[in-house]
Regions:
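Low-complexity, polar-biased intrinsically disordered regions enriched in Pro/Ser/Thr/Gly
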Residues: 80-84, 116, 184
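Carbohydrate-active enzyme catalytic cores, enriched for enzymes
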Residues: 1-104, 109, 156-160
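Extended, loop-rich substrate-binding clefts of extracytoplasmic carbohydrate-active enzymes
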Residues: 54-71, 137, 141-185
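Positively charged, low-complexity intrinsically disordered regions
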Residues: 5-8, 127, 174
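Active-site rim segments in enzyme catalytic domains, especially the processed small/beta chain
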Residues: 90-150
Length: 185
């Protein structure tokens, strides 16, 4: 199985959360649900999951999709209650997948507390596929607090259109507002 294919989690979620619609999305990996009592006979028939563009505004993720190609735009706020808990400086970053190939990816982070400098590099604005202004972070890092960001920026989705002949997402954030005038990209 491709390491990027996480449909087996939908198979588990289908059983644990009784979400019939996840059964179709999990194919062919629904078999993971066997560990929690699902059987082929007990599984309801589900229609195929929608494959068009979709918005998850509560989580701040917007996906523009055409067939198997997609662009994911990250519009989620910096953390919980204004504290950037376990957050990266990735506002308005994009992930792009075309013709079976990852073009732009989120770098993630493979380490945490063993190397604080490396961890901060991986969660920096420059590590993500988004705009960096004057080499500044979208949200300032807080020294000594690896899992926190200063809540400097707010993100706002201005327009979301999908399902028609034109699909559009217009969003902005104010992470550079605290910087001096005449920024250099």
């Amino acid at each position: 199985r491709d390491v990027r294919d996480h449909r087996h989690l939908l198979g588990l979620g289908r059983v644990l959360f009784d979400r019939v619609e996840w059964r179709a999305a999990a194919r062919p990996s629904w078999i993971e649900g066997l560990w929690f009592g699902a059987t082929p006979e007990s599984e309801p028939t589900a229609t195929a999951a929608p494959t068009g563009s979709i918005a998850f505004p509560a989580g701040g993720f917007y996906i523009l999709r055409h067939e198997q190609d997609y662009l994911l735009l990250n519009c989620n706020p910096p953390g919980t209650n204004g504290v950037g808990t376990h957050k990266h400086n990735d506002l308005l970053s994009v992930e792009l997948y075309i013709d079976g190939e990852d073009i732009l990816v989120d770098p993630g982070c493979f380490l945490y507390t063993s190397d604080p400098q490396a961890y901060n590099r991986f969660r920096s604005t420059r590590a993500h596929s988004t705009v960096t202004v004057d080499q500044a972070e979208q949200n300032r890092l807080i020294p000594g607090k690896l899992f926190c960001l200063h809540p400097d920026s707010r993100v706002q989705v201005l327009q979301w259109e999908s399902g028609g002949p034109v699909e559009r997402l217009v969003a902005e954030h104010d992470g550079a507002a605290r910087l001096e005038l005449a920024p250099v990209l």
